[in-house]
Design a protein with these regions (language model features):
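Serine residues within intrinsically disordered or low-complexity segments
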Residues: 7, 29, 37-39
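Intrinsic-disorder-associated, low-complexity terminal segments enriched in Asp/Asn/His/Tyr and depleted
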Residues: 2, 26, 35-38
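Absolute N-terminal positional cue centered near the fourth residue
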Residues: 4-7, 48
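Active-site-adjacent structural elements in enzyme catalytic cores
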Residues: 33-34, 38-384
Length: 384
């Protein structure tokens, strides 16, 4: 059964630095500054937790960014692992903390569209039209980078992905830091993306300097990525903004092959989520597509002993005694987007040998949900 996990309980603390005591926010009562030796590449650090978006907390979080630290940031899509996008050393720490391949580019986050000209060359009118309609929101635009944006941030590309997140805490931190924040999803590379602070604690506690709890993510899947450097524009990753909404502004949009399959070895990804296996729980996943009734019956008939199920609400009763995670009603793709990563991640805490998942059709937000499930499965898909 799907359950929304609450944020960890928080208690006020004082943080000691350079012999001084100063209030920085809140810290989970059960996670008080654990020192964890994570790896030889990334030394253990004390993680400070912020909860209330006070002026003091925003400034303290911004200082972490300015000083080259790593900060978990809330957005409407998923939680991000943020650093100063212009600081190559800080950006390198993102890759090390996540275990992320360095040819996998990062998205930079800005507080509004006026920042586009700071970091992008030859910004086309279409970019401003999209920003006017969809920013702040779950849309990333690929544009030519200015030299101020390091190649380390862009994965070696001459383009950069830019978005304005629809979360007041993160926009306030960006504005206070006065630098763009490079932020991939805050999970360990390859795992399901974090949609609440508990997920961030699970993956990054003791690896990064700060985490800002902004509550559960309203959208639940990453941003849609559109490449505006080609004609027609190209969808590189489906996400929280449906393809149909983009085409209402831009006209026809091509869909990159990476949306429906993995890139081959040697092919360079132009955006996050294109090349590598992503979003995967520990147990192998099989995705079953087709009519919801037919796919549910197929899983019921073929489900191995010890396997778990991700299914639509209407079909939970077909799997008594099984480990089940409810993806939401078959017709409610927005709810499926909010639940998909939680369902995948929760199976890591259960004794399942493999996972069978129902999958929505690709209309609207269904394209993003389908993409995340299929990537979690390494595109191991059964059509019924």
């Amino acid at each position: 059964m799907h359950q929304t996990r609450p944020s960890a309980p928080f208690l006020p603390i004082l943080f000691r630095q350079d012999g001084k005591e100063w209030a920085v926010g809140d810290i989970p009562s059960l996670q008080i500054c654990k020192n964890i030796s994570n790896s030889k590449k990334e030394p253990h650090v004390k993680t400070v937790y912020f909860r209330d978006p006070t002026k003091e907390n925003i400034e303290a979080a911004a200082k972490i960014i300015r000083d080259g630290g790593l900060l978990a940031i809330p957005t409407e899509t998923v939680y991000g692992l943020g650093a100063d996008a212009l600081n190559e050393d800080a950006v390198l720490r993102i890759f090390l903390a996540k275990g992320r391949p360095q040819d996998n580019p990062l998205i930079i986050h800005v507080p509004d569209s006026s920042w586009l000209v700071r970091y992008c060359e030859n910004v086309p009118p279409e970019a401003y039209a999209l920003a006017e309609k969809f920013w702040p929101g779950p849309l990333t635009m690929i544009l030519p980078r200015k030299p101020i944006v390091p190649l380390r941030t862009t994965g070696g590309l001459e383009t950069v992905g830019v978005r304005c997140p629809n979360h007041p805490i993160t926009r306030a931190v960006i504005a206070a830091a006065d630098v763009p924040i490079a932020a991939p999803s805050g999970n360990t590379s390859g795992r399901p993306s974090p949609t609440c602070i508990a997920d961030m604690i699970e993956d990054m506690d003791g690896k990064i300097e700060g985490m800002f709890d902004g509550g559960p993510c309203a959208v639940g899947v990453e941003s849609t990525i559109i490449d505006l450097t080609c004609t027609p524009p190209r969808l590189l990753r489906p996400g929280g903004l449906p393809l149909e909404a983009l085409e209402a502004v831009l006209g026809h949009v091509d869909v990159d092959k990476a949306v429906v399959s993995l890139l081959k070895d040697g092919e360079r990804p132009k955006a996050p989520g294109m090349k590598y296996r992503h979003y995967a729980p520990k147990a192998p996943v099989t995705v079953v597509t087709g009519d919801p009734e037919a796919s549910a019956r197929y899983i019921q008939t073929h489900l191995p002993e010890g396997a778990g199920v991700i299914c639509f609400t209407e079909y939970k009763d077909l799997f008594p005694g099984r480990s089940i995670h409810d993806l939401g009603p078959a017709a409610d793709k927005a709810e499926q987007a909010r639940r998909v990563f939680d369902a995948l991640r929760e199976f890591d805490h259960e004794a399942v040998t493999e996972i069978y998942a129902q999958c929505p059709d690709t209309a609207g937000l269904g394209l993003a949900v389908s993409n995340r499930l299929k990537k979690a499965a390494g595109f191991h898909v059964i059509e019924v």
